[in-house]
Regions:
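Catalytic domains of carbohydrate-active enzymes, especially glycoside hydrolases
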Residues: 25-57, 170-179, 273, 279-285, ...
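Substrate-binding cleft of secreted/luminal carbohydrate-active enzymes
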Residues: 41-46, 272-298, 306, 314-397
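The substrate-binding groove and active-site-proximal loops of carbohydrate-active enzymes
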Residues: 9-22, 59-75, 146-164, 218-231, ...
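Active-site-adjacent "subsite" loops/lids of carbohydrate-active enzymes
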Residues: 2-22, 93-169, 173
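Aromatic-lined substrate-binding rim segments of carbohydrate-active enzymes
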Residues: 31, 49-97, 220-246, 300
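Aromatic-lined carbohydrate-binding/catalytic grooves of carbohydrate-active enzymes
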Residues: 38-73, 192-197, 289-309
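Aromatic-lined carbohydrate-recognition surfaces of secreted/lumenal glycan-active proteins
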Residues: 5-7, 91-103, 180-187, 223-267, ...
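Aromatic- and acidic-residue-enriched segments that line the glycan-binding/catalytic groove
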Residues: 54-68, 100-145, 183-215
Length: 397
């Protein structure tokens, strides 16, 4: 069984015909296509950003494409998607993120040289109310001066609670079968892989455990990375309890390997603990934060951090995918109830490679993106400009 990952906002903003997914009828037809052509038995539905309390901002003459996408949708995807997915024999899952809380609009002189992407992400921004109300939760460097915008430190119990409350508020009233928590981030990459994470709760926990203040003294870096990773496990454990009460399942998706990776850092990715403790039902590996899975443009191409012990962008510290699955993931997954899926949204379609992966012991299936499959003409044109307002709209503003 494969999974189809659907970023609804990308479809509405850049899709064509049925691939725009702007009506329930179009969705119904594409669900059957995903089932029959992609072998999908489940759908990960990434909702519109407008469901998360936050603020859009834009330079004069622009509007955020996500803000535009949210306008004029006269149907409730949270009601329609689960029902139609089941009619098509697909299990519906709600797709959410944890390290993708956005950022305020940067000054013009900064945007000239540093931006998410030049086609539709240079002169617009969005930031969650959660990080506007709690800026201290953003991960901070050792000097306490610089923060990674959009990335919340999970060392704060209150921050973890806020995420669990947000997600449960979204999924509990719906008929989605489970929650897919994606660890990808669209935030500006850290300059170095161990730059951030020195928030007060983490500093205090390390001091209590080892007697060392990481902001003033030399410390064992592996122990520090493990501590940072433990907060992610704490979040997943707390979320698991809430989801089980509601009768919902849990899937986690991230990079492959043992660290969170670009653009975030070297914090340990303790997936073995999640499997051992039965905290997740599904694990998706081989994700990529540095490239859009729909349009394939590079995010923050002028920023590529250094110092990663494992880096999926250049292969540092990683074996081949096939070897990694067979030698590392399979032995851990084999004696568990966790299902392992391999993300393919960042790969050219290859029936041979896909068949080999599906035949690899331990692999339950693959994850494909819907956008490129549904919009081949738009993909060929490769024109993803959006956000610039027509002249009449600019004058009215």
């Amino acid at each position: 069984m494969n999974i189809v990952s659907v970023s609804w906002g990308d479809h509405i903003s850049f899709g064509e015909g049925d691939g725009k997914l702007d009506t329930p009828e179009k969705l119904r037809r594409r669900l059957a296509v995903w089932r029959d052509e992609l072998g999908a038995g489940a759908v990960h539905w990434r909702m519109l950003r407008s469901r998360i309390p936050g603020t859009y901002s834009a330079a004069p003459g622009y509007r955020h494409p996500s803000e535009t996408a949210a306008r004029g949708q006269g149907w409730d995807d949270f009601e329609i998607v689960p029902a139609m997915a089941r009619e098509a024999s697909l299990s519906p899952w709600l797709y959410v993120t944890v390290w993708d809380e956005g950022w305020p609009l940067a000054p013009e002189q900064v945007r000239r040289v540093s931006y998410h992407n030049e086609m539709h992400g240079q002169h617009v921004a969005w930031q969650s109310d959660l990080t506007r109300d709690h800026p201290q939760w953003l991960t901070v460097d050792g000097a306490g001066r610089e923060r990674q915008l959009g990335v919340v430190s999970l060392a704060y119990p209150e921050a973890r609670h806020a995420f669990v409350q947000r997600w449960m508020g979204l999924i509990e009233p719906t008929e989605f079968d489970g929650l897919f928590v994606c660890l990808r981030s669209q935030s500006r990459p850290a300059d170095t892989a161990d730059q951030f994470g020195f928030n007060e709760p983490a500093r205090r926990d390390f001091l209590d455990r080892y007697g060392i203040d990481v902001t003033r003294e030399a410390f064992v870096i592996d122990a520090w990375r493990d501590l940072l990773g433990s907060y992610l496990t704490a979040l997943i454990g707390e979320l698991r309890v809430a989801l089980e009460r509601a009768g919902k399942r849990l899937a986690i998706g991230g990079a492959r390997g043992d660290v969170v990776g670009p653009p975030l850092g070297n914090a340990t990715l303790p997936w073995r603990d999640w499997v051992r403790l039965n905290l997740v039902d599904r694990l998706v590996i081989n994700q990529n934060s540095s490239q859009c899975p729909s349009m394939w443009h590079q995010l923050w191409p002028m920023h590529r951090g250094t110092g990663y012990v494992q880096n999926y962008l250049d292969g540092t510290g990683l074996p081949s995918l096939a070897e990694h699955v067979s030698e590392t993931y399979r032995p851990v997954i084999a004696d568990s109830r966790v299902k392992l899926f391999v993300a393919r949204q960042w790969c050219e379609r290859s029936p041979e490679a896909e068949a080999r992966l599906c035949a690899t012991p331990g692999v339950a299936g693959l994850v494909f993106g819907s956008f490129r499959h549904d919009n081949p003409d738009a993909v060929r044109r490769n024109d993803w400009r959006a956000g610039r307002l027509p002249r009449d709209d600019q004058q009215r503003r």
